[in-house]
Amino acid sequence: SGYNNGTDTGSSGGDGKGRVWILNVKTGAVIRELNTNVGSATDPSGLAHLSAFSQRGDVDATVEAVYGGDLLGNVWRFDLSGNTTSSWFIAKVAELKTTGGSAQPITTEPELGVVQNK
């Protein structure tokens, strides 16, 4: 599911909701699916162009969070910092709209950085 929710003959279309799948690198097994629950088949979220964040890059490069935007103007944080997969969560960190209320699509990956170790 995502931006292209078109269907081919004999296949079902996506639901248009933004999702991130965390996979086992060796086996390809799904460790966890994180679903924004935003979007629909007729108005897909188009979540794409994700950026991974690690404040511990000099130690072990463990990803602590993933950020991404969607075509509905939302910026998301997929927090992977918890010790168990059940503690991982999603937070909407911004919703970009015009003064008239129209969504401003996010079409590039977020640029991430640390400001004074915060």
How should these model regions be labeled?
Residues 1-118:
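A fold-level detector for beta-propeller and closely related beta-sheet-rich head/sensor domains
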